[in-house]
């Protein structure tokens, strides 16, 4: 059985290698052909598993994740798996709605008597998984242990504006700020900082005890994490008895696990081609909804060519996102015109758009002082990771920019090397994604404020504009929602003109699941909240709800 399996894998690798070579030379029709061949290869591979199906455990939902969480202490873990699994084990003071706004969590309500004082009133009767009651003392300890260095974590910087935390009574906790900070509530919500028991130290990372709908059972590095339902949960109880997260680093193997029935769910863990193939499986279903993860291009504004605003605008006009969305993303994405997703309360859709217009791009390049000489105006180098879809995207961008006289050289690196170069300013153009961080408008300070050049922030392109700095500073300290929204609207218009980024698209959240799983929901953040409502049905009949 092993020899045919390896033969298919070998054939698939050859198809991918040929497709990359052809795409770098050719056109979108070759790009489409390569994707079609890949779909057929994947389909052949998945068909091979027909005789290898597994019988699922009727009491355990098995979910595929790409890697192990780095640390399940909510004060420390920063990677996506840590934060998303933590959100099932722990409760935060606040939660987030589908409009990416805050809502009650452990705190049933809160008061802001002045810009420097936040008073949170906790639900009574909440218990940790070991039976201890959750009180204001636990909330104070969680943040004090972080701010006072008892636990060493990069998350401490998020709460640097907190001066002190007082316990007014068992169910009232008061945050005192050093200066007004409008984003505090966001930084106390969903997965940002789960509350740990009083006195907790570094043992939380190994044996987490929270108050959430699931309790920790076990974890083995690079293998799995197991959670069980918290039958004493204070809120709406989960339906699943047990959830097992299995670590499957290889994309093709993830598809095989779903096809065999040895896994029930994977979210945002498969290529678009694999999703389309699995959608034809009678035992599987696919659901997708708009997400917030942003793909973007960034420029080094210290570069003599790219510091010219007309050049950056010309690049935006030269790029045609349509074939990339259709053939690379297979329709599982939508165009982006802002760092913020449309679901955000601060999103401004009324900004200058850069629809594909090669003639306008050529005009701007002429105005910028770059005439064509033998068909080439100048060379640019784009750095990217070795991830497959990123390489294919770069090849198509190379072709599109060539049509306006820009020669784009592509350099791919393993992610650690690539990211090191990006953070040290060793690039002209690079492509990356924002995952989660762009859901709150305070991201603008981290990415575009002139005080946030690396290592102090993520302004990796060294963008500096006094107008942008002033708008960011004012919005961060303004507590009135309507005024903040107006400030962020103006900021997004200013950035759309200056164009330190080209925002490409927002990825959909795509969930592939066994039809024995029902009552699923999706939210824009792409977290694992759907496990809080999911049920296992022995009849394998699915009842799917897509919450948009």
Which residues make up each language-model segment?
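Gly/Pro-rich hinge or "lid" segments in bacterial periplasmic/extracellular proteins
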Residues: 101, 180-181, 186-238, 242, ...
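Extracytoplasmic/peripheral linker and loop segments enriched in polar/acidic and small residues
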Residues: 119, 407-418, 446-515, 539
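Ligand/substrate-recognition segments at binding pockets and active sites
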Residues: 52-55, 221, 368-436, 481
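Surface-exposed binding/hinge segments that line
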Residues: 111, 121, 155-197
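Append "and occasionally in soluble cytosolic enzymes with long acidic Gly/Pro-rich linkers
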Residues: 229, 306-399, 464, 471, ...
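Long beta-strand-rich cores associated with HINT superfamily self-processing modules
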Residues: 511-540
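N-terminal lobe/hinge region of extracytoplasmic solute-binding protein
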Residues: 65-114, 144, 207-211
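Ligand-site clamp/hinge motif
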Residues: 202, 231-276, 398-399, 407-409
């Amino acid at each position: 059985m092993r020899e045919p399996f390896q033969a298919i894998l070998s054939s698939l690798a050859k198809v991918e290698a040929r497709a990359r070579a052809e795409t770098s030379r050719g056109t979108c029709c070759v790009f489409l052909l390569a994707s079609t061949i890949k779909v057929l290869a994947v389909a052949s591979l998945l068909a091979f598993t027909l005789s290898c199906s597994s019988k699922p455990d009727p009491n355990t939902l098995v979910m595929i994740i790409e890697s192990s969480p780095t640390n399940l202490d909510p004060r420390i873990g920063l990677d996506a798996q840590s934060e998303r699994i933590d959100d099932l084990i722990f409760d935060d003071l606040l939660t987030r709605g589908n409009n990416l706004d805050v809502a009650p969590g452990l705190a049933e309500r809160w008061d802001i008597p002045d810009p420097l004082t936040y008073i949170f009133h906790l639900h009574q009767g909440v218990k940790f998984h070991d039976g201890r009651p959750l009180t204001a003392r636990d909330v104070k300890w969680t943040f004090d242990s972080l701010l006072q260095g008892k636990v060493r974590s990069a998350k401490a910087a998020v709460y640097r504006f907190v001066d002190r935390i007082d316990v007014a009574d068992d169910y009232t906790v008061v945050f005192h700020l050093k200066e007004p900070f409008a984003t505090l509530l966001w930084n106390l919500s969903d997965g940002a900082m789960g509350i740990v028991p009083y006195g907790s130290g570094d043992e939380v990372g190994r044996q987490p005890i929270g108050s959430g709908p699931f309790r920790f059972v076990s974890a083995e590095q690079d293998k799995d994490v197991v959670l069980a339902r918290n039958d004493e949960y204070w809120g709406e109880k989960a339906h699943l008895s047990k959830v097992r997260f299995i670590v499957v680093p290889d994309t093709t193997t993830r598809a095989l696990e779903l096809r065999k029935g040895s896994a029930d769910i994977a979210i945002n863990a498969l290529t678009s081609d694999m999703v389309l193939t699995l959608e034809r499986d009678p035992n599987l279903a696919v659901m997708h909804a708009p997400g917030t993860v942003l793909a973007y291009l960034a420029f080094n504004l210290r570069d003599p060519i790219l510091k010219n605003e007309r050049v950056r605008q010309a690049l935006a006009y030269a790029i045609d996102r349509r074939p990339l969305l259709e053939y690379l993303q297979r329709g599982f994405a939508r165009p982006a015109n802002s760092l913020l997703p449309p679901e955000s309360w601060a999103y401004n859709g009324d900004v200058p758009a850069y629809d594909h217009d090669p003639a306008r791009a050529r005009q701007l390049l002429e105005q910028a002082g770059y005439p064509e000489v033998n068909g080439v105006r100048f060379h640019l180098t784009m750095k990217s990771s070795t991830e497959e879809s990123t390489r294919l995207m770069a090849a198509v961008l190379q072709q599109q920019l060539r049509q306006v006289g820009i020669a784009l050289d592509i350099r791919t690196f393993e992610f650690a090397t690539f990211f090191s170069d990006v953070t040290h300013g060793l690039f002209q153009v690079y492509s990356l994604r924002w995952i989660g961080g762009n859901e709150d408008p305070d991201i603008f300070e981290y990415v575009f404020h002139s005080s946030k050049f690396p290592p102090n922030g993520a302004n990796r392109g060294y963008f500096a504009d006094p107008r942008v700095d002033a708008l960011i500073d004012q919005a961060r300290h303004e507590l009135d929602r309507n005024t903040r929204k107006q400030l962020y609207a103006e900021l997004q218009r200013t950035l759309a003109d200056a164009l330190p980024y080209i925002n490409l698209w927002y990825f959909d959240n795509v969930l592939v699941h066994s039809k024995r799983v029902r009552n699923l929901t999706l939210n824009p953040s792409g977290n694992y909240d759907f496990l809080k409502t999911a049920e296992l049905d022995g009849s394998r009949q699915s009842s799917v709800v897509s919450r948009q």
